[in-house]
């Protein structure tokens, strides 16, 4: 099986050693699923927004990339049981004057292209301008360079950046619920495979493997 994943979105996807080794919660979870499927899995890393055409055009068999189940995505693809609840989080630089959701009024917000976060920003009706970035590194750079006033990203990713660079960033407000959880995405004709994956996810939860993997990252 060829598994499509995101180029870089810690703690879900992390490249290390000159991009030769890939790890992270999504990767470890998928490798365990592959082991239980008795399948050989190869990971292909894409810019997040390119994962959708890659799956549609069958360059990959499955996608795991902190992929949120949304109504829009369900029109085109099928999803496994969610393996984690999905939340978003606003983040800004430590010296920013933005401290609350109200302070976000009329501000420029950076989001990763292909995520449901642009829609979430605009639905808050704060007259925001959304700036799209292909890579999370570029989005954080845009934040540092004042191209944007704040960014909206996966809650776990925001917590990761806060922990790794506490003197650079701060969180704005609490996490916000979005979608129906993080899930493994497939083309509709792969429903038999998704059923097998669902069974494995439940087994992993029951035998403690899921909690062990989760505890390594969160």
Across the structure, where does each feature detected by a protein language model lie?
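Extracytoplasmic small-molecule ligand-binding "clamshell" domains
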Residues: 1-66, 75, 132
């Amino acid at each position: 099986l060829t598994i499509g994943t995101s180029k870089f979105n810690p703690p879900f996807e992390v490249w290390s050693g000159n991009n030769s080794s890939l790890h992270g919660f999504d990767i470890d979870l998928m490798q365990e699923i592959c082991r239980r499927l008795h399948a050989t899995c190869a990971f292909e890393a894409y810019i997040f927004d390119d994962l959708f055409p890659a799956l549609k055009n069958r360059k990959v068999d499955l996608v795991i990339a902190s992929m949120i189940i949304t109504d829009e995505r369900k029109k085109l693809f099928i999803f496994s049981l969610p393996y984690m609840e999905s939340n978003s989080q606003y983040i800004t630089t430590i010296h920013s004057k933005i401290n609350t959701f109200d302070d976000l009024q009329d501000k420029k917000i950076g989001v990763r292209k292909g995520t449901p976060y642009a829609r979430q920003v605009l639905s808050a009706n704060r007259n925001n301008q959304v700036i799209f970035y292909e890579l999370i590194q570029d989005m954080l750079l845009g934040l540092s360079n004042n191209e944007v006033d704040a960014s909206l990203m996966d809650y776990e990713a925001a917590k990761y950046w806060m922990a790794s660079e506490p003197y650079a960033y701060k969180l704005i407000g609490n996490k916000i619920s979005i979608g129906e959880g993080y899930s493994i995405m497939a083309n509709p004709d792969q429903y038999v495979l998704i059923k097998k994956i669902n069974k494995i996810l439940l087994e992993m939860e029951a035998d403690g493997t899921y909690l062990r993997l989760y505890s390594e990252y969160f």
